[in-house]
Amino acid sequence: MSEKHPGPLVVEGKLTDAERMKLESNYLRGTIAEDLNDGLTGGFKGDNFLLIRFHGMYQQDDRDIRAERAEQKLEPHHAMLLRCRLPGGVITTKQWQAIDKFAGENTIYGSIRLTNRQTFQFHGILKKNVKPVHQMLHSVGLDALATANDMNRNVLCTSNPYESQLHAEAYEWAKKISEHLLPRTRAYAEIWLDQEKVATTDEEPILGQTYLPRKFKTTVVIPPQNDIDLHANDMNFVAIAENGKLVGFNLLVGGGLSIEHGNKKTYARTASEFGYLPLEHTLAVAEAVVTTQRDWGNRTDRKNAKTKYTLERVGVETFKAEVERRAGIKFEPIRPYEFTGRGDRIGWVKGIDDNWHLTLFIENGRILDYPGRPLKTGLLEIAKIHKGDFRITANQNLIIAGVPESEKAKIEKIAKESGLMNAVTPQRENSMACVSFPTCPLAMAEAERFLPSFIDNIDNLMAKHGVSDEHIVMRVTGCPNGCGRAMLAEVGLVGKAPGRYNLHLGGNRIGTRIPRMYKENITEPEILASLDELIGRWAKEREAGEGFGDFTVRAGIIRPVLDPARDLWD
């Protein structure tokens, strides 16, 4: 990233209403507890509608029937989405059995949705079941604290079961970072777990009384895998190992993908390298990055409030120097690291500890019993007999981790009988979508419901051009908020309107380049016609080992995005 003339450290002006709401919320309590008892509406009123996000929930409604209900003079069919806090995606089989039961008995859709932030979501929780879901999670050692809104969200960690020792160390750091950056308010425990109100004043030494200016995302990544897509995140700790043992981290700050259609003040941005730090400084540095963003982030405009915009406004070196000052360290030069891929290794992998790990491809992360493919029942049966744990990946897949040789056949039999090991193409394995319709209030176009048939069509094109054994990192996101991480794909579709998408090209396989818009507001047939021609050219003209995204740049089909703050919209 180029350094532009540094701007003000703090943006002066009228604060957004979100800042008022946080300040007046009494450390995130609001009147949520009272609202729970209001049976006249299925939703939360006033500030509580937004405050519940700090407690891991979003209020949604079924958009498929919204117009019909409006005609009948009924309020929207409100239900909550709840997202669990699950650093590194590791969940025990006991916990899995509990969430399976809750999903089946207490949600409208009956499904467990794995997300690309290595956790699970319940969709369709009615208001009467909101308190019970928090209590169920607590009973098995889980919570939903700080998985949404202006806090440090669920901390990701590379799913690398092969190098078990390194993964174990990195995972422990992901947990420590998550715990260190949690809010200290007792609101969550008081409202959901019926813990007594204590006559002490709440304090938030790290997050402050008005919390962060905007959402904040953190990862721990183990090269050469970039499965967690570090450049989509505000703060990234890249594991540096010596002789298979973790010794420190490279720190990269200021990634983020969310944009707004037509708003050139918004842009996706890759993270900037700050330097290397030994392990013992990890928590101090994490806190320093968060508090610098807390104090310098833009609280007058939520569309320009994320860390990426703060870095561009004040300058990377200024931000880095402030982090060093607050943490009491000097960063060492970045240690060498490289990425070779982002996908999960589907199927069995033997770890260096001689245990086996089975990665199951879960299309769109949606776990449900489908006709002839009882995925949810199959995973429940595995959870009942498996002595290791489950791991949710950032590609929305699931790893049955730590399977001894003696248990392998038994687990494989259940997985095969449940449709969990059905053969899929390399292209399908490397494609992903966010949830979008019918539950997401921000959705502009279909994503999860669109992807399976769209990939059928892409598979046909790959076969037509003789490249069925290859893949293109392809992602669909229903709106420019970017949950599907399309702005780090080789081919990214960003929803514009029902049935219409912006087509972005020119990202790369390893997720280190932002793609540029190639065509705007086009339909699926138009997308397929463009990709038919381009895949054909790639098949014929590519160099050895050249990915589709790199080819589109080299062939002059699309100009690479070099400095997105300045050239993304050119």
Curated annotation (Swiss-Prot):
GO terms for cellular component: sulfite reductase complex (NADPH). Its cofactor is siroheme; [4Fe-4S] cluster. InterPro entries: CysI (IPR011786), NiRdtase/SiRdtase_haem-b_fer (IPR005117), Nit/Sulf_reduc_fer-like_dom_sf (IPR036136), NO2/SO3_Rdtase_4Fe4S_dom (IPR006067), NO2/SO3_Rdtase_4Fe4S_prot (IPR045169), NO2/SO3_Rdtase_4Fe4S_sf (IPR045854), NO2/SO3_Rdtase_FeS/sirohaem_BS (IPR006066). Siroheme binds at C483. Pathway: Sulfur metabolism; hydrogen sulfide biosynthesis; hydrogen sulfide from sulfite (NADPH route): step 1/1. One of its GO terms (biological process) is sulfate assimilation. It holds the Pfam family NIR_SIR_ferr. Keywords: 4Fe-4S, Amino-acid biosynthesis, Cysteine biosynthesis, Heme, Iron, Iron-sulfur, Metal-binding, NADP, Oxidoreductase. Its EC number is 1.8.1.2. It is an enzyme of class 1 (oxidoreductase). It catalyses: hydrogen sulfide + 3 NADP(+) + 3 H2O = sulfite + 3 NADPH + 4 H(+). One of its GO terms (molecular function) is sulfite reductase (NADPH) activity. Binds 1 siroheme per subunit. Binds 1 [4Fe-4S] cluster per subunit. [4Fe-4S] cluster binds at C434, C440, C479, C483. Alpha(8)-beta(8). The alpha component is a flavoprotein, the beta component is a hemoprotein. Belongs to the nitrite and sulfite reductase 4Fe-4S domain family. PANTHER family: SULFITE REDUCTASE [NADPH] SUBUNIT BETA, SULFITE REDUCTASE [NADPH] SUBUNIT BETA-RELATED. HAMAP family: CysI (MF_01540). Component of the sulfite reductase complex that catalyzes the 6-electron reduction of sulfite to sulfide. This is one of several activities required for the biosynthesis of L-cysteine from sulfate. This is Sulfite reductase [NADPH] hemoprotein beta-component. It comes from Shigella boydii serotype 4 (strain Sb227). The lineage of its organism: Bacteria, Pseudomonadati, Pseudomonadota, Gammaproteobacteria, Enterobacterales.
